């Protein structure tokens, strides 16, 4: 009998969009090309839980293909929404290796509430995001109602956005903490819509002209909101930052984006951060630091203000399979960073996790630290920017640091770079105001 060897991996190298869900990873392998048309991908859906990959073949979804986004259901466990660049939306129930279709969402099943492209039955649902009220917003491009929403009760509605949005080829979408919906328009800037009580109120288009966005280019490729509410925008000609997005809907207020410049000499001839790199994706980690995935030059990792490059990954200096980065996703629980390239997925153990609201579940790992272990000691469950001081039982401080988001890392060495002696060590932890405190014990065995 022939031997069939099936690797524990995604079924193919296609990784158009990656989505994390409480430690689980979903991969949408479909996509669209540079002019925004379907690529007719039939790879299905890939799912990573723990160390095991499960591949759900496209045959499970009938004619549904070009799956470009997976979004976890916000309230129903093991349910996801899958969006297709051609066939609308599916709500799916996942049970191990089996999957069942709960419902299809398209023009026919919503009695016309979700219009298709020119009444053809084609729906290119490019992206989804969740607001604070449990509404899932989605892009419905090339229609007269390009902004759609799935309400918590399952009702589907789509909205027109005035002249700026009529027929717009809207792709990526983001809901901000300030109640705005941002939609990338292919080669035509960004639509920003203000929500009130879950209903669109007004829409403004941001472009490359001064006074209406002043973007480096109207070919916007991505955007991300950081922990300070600032919007980082990637275009085919570099990076821009909108520091006060609330100004967009305020009369007589500027909402032009800023180009970040590093001018070390102060002579006014500084260099733009990331230059004119085409930036396909931006992700913000638990420490508010920025990951930039470029179209041809790998990955850049910077500090929170973007002006200091911390790391650079490329095909030549790292395990990246390609310098063409399609998507970046961060597992906020572990700090693991996933890079989707045109040649497959690569993961990297980052240092930052999402900060906790309280420190009720602080722990160290590994603990005890066994003889021969030389890796990092992780202290997790911390609030953002927690102060950590590690002492021996006599109270001598051997190490101190500030948490990266919700995690602090100790290499098991003292201030002189020497490995500490065997014994019990105490990690004294406090928030940045010194109000909330916690203590963790770490046993070192040499």
Model-derived features: positions:
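Carboxylate-rich, polar loop motifs that coordinate divalent cations or form catalytic acidic clusters
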Residues: 1-361, 397, 428
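Repeat-blade elements of multi-bladed beta-propeller folds
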Residues: 220, 325-326, 372-377, 423
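Surface-exposed loops/turns
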Residues: 322, 371, 384, 416, ...
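Short, glycine-anchored, charge-dense loop/turn motifs used at functional sites
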Residues: 387-398, 425
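Short, surface-exposed loop/turn motifs with a glycine/proline- and acidic-biased composition
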Residues: 403-434
């Amino acid at each position: 009998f022939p031997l069939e060897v099936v690797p524990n991996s995604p079924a193919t190298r296609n990784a158009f969009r990656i989505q994390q869900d409480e430690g689980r990873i979903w991969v949408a392998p479909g996509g669209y090309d540079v002019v925004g048309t379907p690529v007719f991908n039939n790879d299905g859906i890939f799912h990573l839980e723990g160390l095991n990959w499960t591949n759900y073949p496209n045959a499970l979804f009938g004619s549904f293909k070009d799956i470009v986004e997976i979004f976890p259901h916000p309230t129903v466990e093991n349910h996801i929404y899958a969006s297709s660049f051609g066939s609308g939306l599916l709500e799916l129930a996942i049970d191990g290796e089996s999957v069942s279709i709960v419902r299809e969402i398209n023009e026919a099943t919503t009695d016309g509430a979700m219009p298709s492209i020119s009444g053809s039955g084609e729906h290119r649902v490019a992206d989804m995001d969740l607001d604070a009220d449990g509404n899932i917003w989605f892009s419905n491009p090339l229609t007269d109602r390009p902004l759609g929403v799935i309400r918590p009760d399952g009702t589907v509605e789509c909205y027109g956005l005035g002249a700026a949005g009529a027929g717009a080829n809207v792709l990526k979408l983001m809901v901000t903490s300030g109640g705005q919906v941002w939609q990338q328009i292919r080669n035509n800037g960004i639509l920003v819509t203000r929500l009130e009580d879950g209903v669109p109120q007004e829409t403004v288009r941001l472009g490359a002209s001064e006074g209406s966005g002043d973007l480096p280019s109207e070919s916007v490729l991505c955007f991300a909101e950081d922990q300070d509410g600032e919007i980082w925008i990637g275009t085919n000609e570099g990076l821009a930052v909108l520091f006060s997005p609330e100004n967009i809907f305020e009369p007589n207020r500027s909402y032009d984006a800023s180009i970040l410049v590093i001018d070390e000499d102060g002579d006014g001839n500084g260099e733009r951060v990331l230059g004119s790199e085409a930036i396909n994706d931006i992700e913000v980690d638990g420490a508010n630091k920025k990951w930039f995935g470029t179209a041809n030059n790998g990955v850049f990792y910077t500090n929170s203000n973007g002006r200091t490059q911390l790391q650079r990954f490329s095909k030549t200096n790292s395990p990246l399979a390609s310098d063409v980065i399609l998507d970046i996703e961060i597992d906020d629980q572990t700090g693991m960073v996933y890079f989707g390239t045109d040649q497959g997925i690569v993961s990297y153990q980052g240092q930052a996790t999402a900060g906790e609201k309280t420190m009720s579940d602080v722990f160290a790992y590994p603990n005890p630290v066994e003889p021969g272990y030389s890796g990092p000691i992780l202290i997790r469950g911390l609030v953002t920017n927690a102060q950590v001081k590690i002492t021996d039982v006599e109270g001598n401080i051997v190490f101190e640091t500030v948490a990266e988001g919700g995690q602090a890392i100790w290499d098991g060495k003292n201030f002189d770079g020497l490995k500490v002696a065997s014994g019990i060590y105490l990690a004294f932890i406090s928030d940045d105001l010194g109000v909330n405190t916690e203590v963790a014990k770490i046993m070192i065995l040499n």
